[in-house]
Amino acid sequence: GTADIVIADLPCSGLGVLGKKTDLKYKASPEGIESLVGLQRKILSCVKDFVKPCGVLLYSTCTVNPAENIENVHWFLKEYPEFYLDDIREKLCPELRDSVEEKGCIQLLPGIHQSDGFFIARLKRKPD
């Protein structure tokens, strides 16, 4: 890969934006989420190739569903050991540092962060 950073803001169930799109709660189904997880993994498997050694892959969704968020990150790290979670705590404003769940991941939640629900993971490619 040749990119310093790749941002993968992927299609998701949108469960983090229910306050704005209330119809989503009636459309969400286990089958639909399973299909989205498969699509997210396919996209991640493709875009990782664009990240150069020591480059960053930012994975983000607008959902609070663990299957689409942290579980995808764990899957990705297992499948692609050339990547690791890069600590983001010091890159965040002080108000968000306590929201870091795992070293390189943050889950923003409605009602806590005055925002919609978002998930962001910072995955870094190891040097060659």
Q: How would you describe each model-predicted region?
A:
Residues 3, 9-46, 63-68:
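Mobile active-site "lid"/loop adjacent to the S-adenosyl-L-methionine
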Residues 2-7, 11, 50-128:
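C-terminal catalytic and target-recognition region of SAM-dependent MTase-like enzymes
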